[in-house]
């Protein structure tokens, strides 16, 4: 089974309050694959870095970093806060599969399960421990950060093999 990969750089999800306090008038740059979500033209600054904003607003402010970005910001000796759901603060997102409940049932998957993806080619390899996230409206996509995508030379929108065991 093939699945499309989407590669994300550092970005943030803001609360309504933070969005208003920032003084930014967030305008849509483009829709993204998950229904109802979009990327803003504007960037939010935390005083150190600028983050692309993903909307709509959430209940907690969240700043998603690659492992490389985490190490640059906090150092190698600071254990990353691994994101599984919608934890607040600075997090390193776990690679994950978005899948609808109907598709998940067809594959025998439950929310929180893990699958793998495989990429062929000059940088062939496999990424295990891809967290399964299920919601009725999810589009079937794997989300990777730039570190993971670069390791296997996966381009945004490229298809890879999904391995369900």
What feature does the model see in each segment?
Residues 5-118, 128-159:
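Short beta-strand-centered segments at strand-helix junctions
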Residues 120-124, 165:
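Short, charged beta-turn/beta-strand-edge "cap" motif at the junction between a beta-strand
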Residues 1:
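Catalytic domains of riboflavin
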């Amino acid at each position: 089974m093939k699945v499309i990969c989407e590669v994300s750089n550092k970005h943030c999800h803001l609360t309504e309050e933070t969005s208003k306090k920032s003084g930014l008038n967030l305008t849509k740059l483009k829709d993204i694959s998950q229904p109802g979500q979009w990327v803003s033209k504007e960037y939010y600054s935390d005083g150190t870095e600028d983050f692309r904003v993903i909307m709509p607003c959430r209940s907690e402010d969240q700043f998603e970093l690659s492992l490389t970005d985490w190490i640059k910001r906090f150092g190698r000796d600071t254990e990353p806060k691994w994101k599984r759901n919608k934890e607040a603060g600075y997090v390193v997102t776990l690679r994950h599969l978005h899948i609808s409940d109907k598709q998940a049932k067809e594959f025998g998957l439950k929310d929180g399960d893990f699958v793998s993806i495989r990429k062929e080619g000059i940088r062939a390899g496999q990424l295990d421990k891809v967290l399964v996230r299920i919601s009725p409206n999810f589009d079937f996509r794997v989300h990777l950060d730039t570190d993971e995508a670069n390791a296997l030379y996966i381009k945004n929108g490229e298809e890879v093999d999904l391995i369900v065991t």
